From Swiss-Prot:
The keyword Protease does not apply. Cortex of potato tuber. This is Serine protease inhibitor 8. Gene3D superfamilies: 2.80.10.50. GO terms for molecular function: serine-type endopeptidase inhibitor activity. Belongs to the protease inhibitor I3 (leguminous Kunitz-type inhibitor) family. Keywords: Protease inhibitor, Serine protease inhibitor. The lineage of its organism: Eukaryota, Viridiplantae, Streptophyta, Embryophyta, Tracheophyta.
Length: 42
């Protein structure tokens, strides 16, 4: 579900923007389309 607050991800879930060092982990789904958490990339 694309939104202005969601970075562009590749198929592995890693952000394509090299300036960012965070990955987005989708946790289940909520009424608004899902709960999203930010976590530091390993």
């Amino acid at each position: 579900l694309p939104s202005d607050a969601t970075p562009v991800l590749d198929v592995t879930g890693k952000e394509l923007d090299p300036r960012l060092s965070y990955r987005i982990i989708s946790i289940g789904r909520x009424a608004l389309g899902g709960x999203v958490y930010l976590g530091k990339s390993p």
